[in-house]
Amino acid sequence: MGHDHDHNHDAPAAPVDWREHGVKVIRGDQLDTNTPQTPGMNRAAAINAARVGAQKIWAGTVTIHPNAKTGAHHHGALESVIYVVRGHARMRWGEHLEFTAEAGPGDFIFVPPYVPHQEINASTDDPLECVLVRSDNEAVVVNLNIDAVEAPETVYWVDPIHRHPHDH
């Protein structure tokens, strides 16, 4: 049964110093490049345990130079979300990187735990810039040595509430 009074049963005994324990703004020119790297890309951390005390997420940026690609890798038990800010990403994934899909500015990419994958800058002229968020407070990167297929299958994922754009 609910209460008819207003108070928090879990309130801390001492007042919280919200200046110290509240919102933190991390400036774009103050990102930390001392984070696990994968050949072909540059990662920089904005949010992690060491910098801001994050308990359950890691966030940062990734830049892939024109016509470059990363080595194959996965992120252990972590889920990853990539948001494409600028440029065009070509993702490959699978045991032999046998699947591919592309994403552009404004698109989100979800990478489940333990999925071997590779990010490719689909442009020969412009950098690919993305925001990256992972489901733990530290970056986990396991670089892999994979024999990739020569011609991966293009996959267009359709969620349960949206139609495939070619089904109109």
Where in the sequence are the language-model features?
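Short conserved catalytic/interaction loops centered on acidic-Pro-aromatic/His motifs
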Residues: 98-99, 120-128
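A short hydrophobic beta-strand segment most commonly corresponding to one strand
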Residues: 59-62, 81, 110, 125-143
